[in-house]
Design a protein with these regions (language model features):
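Phosphate/nucleotide-binding beta-alpha loop and adjacent structural elements of enzyme active sites
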Residues: 1-227
Length: 227
């Protein structure tokens, strides 16, 4: 069964990655415009952007805010969050998302490679090598800090969110772990955009089990809709 699912994911993403770049919007590859069109261009909605960066550069949610949507941008990196707080009008949270409310070790990368920062637990050897190479080539430094982590339940209760139209996750390696702590039955989600640079079939397998199907592949992101 695992082999069958792996092949199915490979076949679908290979087909969907053809001509997958959409112009317009703020996302790196047009993910925002793609999602907006898939949802039939609604004039209002709710987004949750986990790993929002500075809220502008390659943002997956700014386009929706400009369209009149409301939502939450979550960014754990303290320095980047300062920029986020100056650029966006939606709810903002300087924290990580985890299974329980806690404190986690976070590798904070300062400089041009700051978008590669992440929770230490989920950064593998290749991630760390990439960070070191970027720092060596372009400058900057890295250090570990402790930051707040909230469960999705706590996050959504804090901002009184009962349903999500668009969930975007770009967290440098811990996307699947975040998805696994969401209760999709308690908080319905219409569409999910999740980074899968390694093209791992694990995301496909898990979200299929949760009732989502792979609709589009846009750049490094896979876009899933509720079946």
């Amino acid at each position: 069964m695992i082999f069958k699912n792996n092949y199915l994911h490979w076949f679908i993403q290979r087909r969907l990655r053809k001509n997958n770049i959409t112009a317009g919007g703020h996302s790196q590859y047009g993910q925002d415009v793609t999602v907006f069109n898939l949802l039939n261009k609604p004039s209002h909605g709710v987004f949750l952007d986990i790993g929002a960066n500075d809220g502008v550069t390659f943002s997956n949610s700014l386009y929706f805010e400009e369209k009149g949507w409301t939502g939450i941008c979550v960014e754990p990196h303290p320095t980047i969050f300062e920029s986020l707080s100056k650029s966006r009008q939606c709810h903002l949270l300087n924290a990580c998302i985890a299974a329980t409310d806690s404190v986690v070790n976070f590798l904070s990368v300062e400089g041009p490679a700051n978008m590669l920062s992440g929770i230490v637990q989920y950064l593998d050897k290749s991630d760390l090598n990439r960070i070191d190479k970027e720092i060596a080539a372009h400058g900057g430094h890295k250090h570990e800090i402790q930051i707040e982590a909230l469960s999705p339940e706590t996050l959504l209760q804090r901002f009184n969110i009962t349903e999500i139209d668009y969930l975007s996750i770009d967290t440098e390696g811990c996307e699947l772990s975040i998805l696994k702590v969401f209760d999709f039955k308690k908080t319905p989600v219409k569409i999910i955009g999740v980074e899968n640079g390694s093209r791992s079939p694990e995301l496909f397998r898990y979200l299929s089990q949760q009732g989502f199907y792979l609709k589009k592949c846009v750049g490094c992101d896979e876009i899933y809709m509720r079946a």
